[in-house]
Amino acid sequence: MKLEKDNAMDRADTLEQQNKEANNRAEKSEEEVHNLQKRMQQLENDLDQVQESLLKANNQLVEKDKALSNAEGEVAALNRRIQLLEEDLERSEERLNTATTKLAEASQAADESERMRKVLENRSLSDEERMDALENQLKEARFLAEEADRKYDEVARKLAMVEADLERAEERAETGESKIVELEEELRVVGNNLKSLEVSEEKANQREEAYKEQIKTLTNKLKAAEARAEFAERSVQKLQKEVDRLEDELVNEKEKYKSITDELDQTFSELSGY
């Protein structure tokens, strides 16, 4: 009986020990479950933050795409404006070439008038012969002016007026020498003015070539800007300022061209006044 009691007590101790171990394992499991729950909550919070960041990044990407599309549109518009500027410069160059040709014709007419003056200097000829030679030279100058652009029609009419004045001068043969001297001096001044105008035309052509080269350089910069899309907006603003500057310079060149043309008209007007 005692043995059974001892055995029962041993089993009771064993069961009690096992119960304690089971309780310890249960507490440890509960702690692990609690830690896992905390970690799950943290992961959920992290997931929310990541999703929010992803949404924000997607929105920023959409905005960047819109900005890039707008920048590409502005670049395309600037390319078109540059093409129009190049075409405008080509037309200006053609007009300058035409003006240079007409200036050369006018210079040739002045040379013919100079040759006429030298003929008149020959004292061995009579006043009538000198006036006839002057009339013939002025007729040649008139023929050259009629072959020029419509803009020089007025010059031809003024030369005809000079021709009429010279015909009337035949009636004043004895006083014609002083008139011839004045005409010689005026022709010399006109020759100098024409040479100055030729130099001005040459400089204007050089400036046109320089501006054309600048626009080619600007076109290359625009192509480079397309490859650097992330800097497109800043590049577009910079190129816009450059295009505006070139447009202003082109307007100035057109004004200078008009000034040269007006000066040429004034020179012929002064020549015809005599």
From Swiss-Prot:
Asked whether the keyword Nucleus is assigned, the reply is no
The cross-references to SUPFAM superfamilies, in alphabetical order and at most eight, read: Tropomyosin
According to the record, the residues making up region (Disordered) are: 1-45
Q: Which domain of life is it from?
A: Eukaryota
| Keyword Coiled coil set for record | yes
- Kindly state which keywords UniProt assigns to this record, in alphabetical order: Allergen, Coiled coil, Repeat
Coiled-coil features, chain-numbered ranges: 1-274
Q: Which InterPro entries match?
A: Tropomyosin
Q: Where is the composition biased (Basic and acidic residues)?
A: 1-35
Subunit structure comment from the entry: Homodimer.
Task: Return the domain comment text from this UniProt entry.
Answer: The molecule is in a coiled coil structure that is formed by 2 polypeptide chains. The sequence exhibits a prominent seven-residues periodicity.
Q: What does this protein do?
A: Tropomyosin, in association with the troponin complex, plays a central role in the calcium dependent regulation of muscle contraction.
Which family does the similarity line name?
A: Belongs to the tropomyosin family.
The entry's protein name is Tropomyosin
